[in-house]
Amino acid sequence: MSILDRKEIFRVEESSLTFEKLVNEAAPEISSGLREKSVVILPSHGHDDVFYAGTLDTLDFLNENGINTDVYASDEEYKELSLHGAEFWLGIFIIQSIVVPVFCGVISSYIYDKLKAKDDDNIALKFMVENKEGKTTAIEFHGKVENLSKAIDAVKSLSDED
């Protein structure tokens, strides 16, 4: 099995991370900007302060499409990690459940229309959805874009809308 044919990962599990915890643990220059956000892009790849290359493009796309989003870093601390390979690395997103329906449409548009991802491309991402009671569920996906809909559907199922 080559690195390009690795096994798909699709995981849904509880998480202890919440928006309140992020705001309370952040430096003041970061926490003040997070309070009104619906989505926060978190550092990725096991680093406290490193984001995947393209994170700012993702941030801009979400904001331009009505999703109030920020990154969990100050401008001075923000660093990107470029991973070269045949894979799209989007990162980790914590999402308030109230915006899930809109977020799912916008992030799908970003993946298919902006990144031009094809069905046989690989993609890696993690969505963490916090419901109105403050409970967070994490959905992690690493696999072919053609199978991404199961992760998007899992996120949609966590929406506060009935």
Give the residues covered by each predicted segment.
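Surface-exposed beta-strand edges and their flanking turn/coil or helix-capping segments
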Residues: 54-56, 84-86, 151-156
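Short glycine-rich, low-complexity/disordered patches
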Residues: 71-78, 162
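Amphipathic, membrane-active segments
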Residues: 110-162
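Short, surface-exposed, polar/charged, turn-prone segments marking secondary-structure boundaries
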Residues: 67-71, 98-100, 155-157
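Membrane-active, amphipathic/fusogenic segments and juxtamembrane/transmembrane anchors
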Residues: 2-74, 131-132, 138-139, 145-148
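Membrane-inserting effector segments that mediate pore formation, membrane fusion
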Residues: 76-126
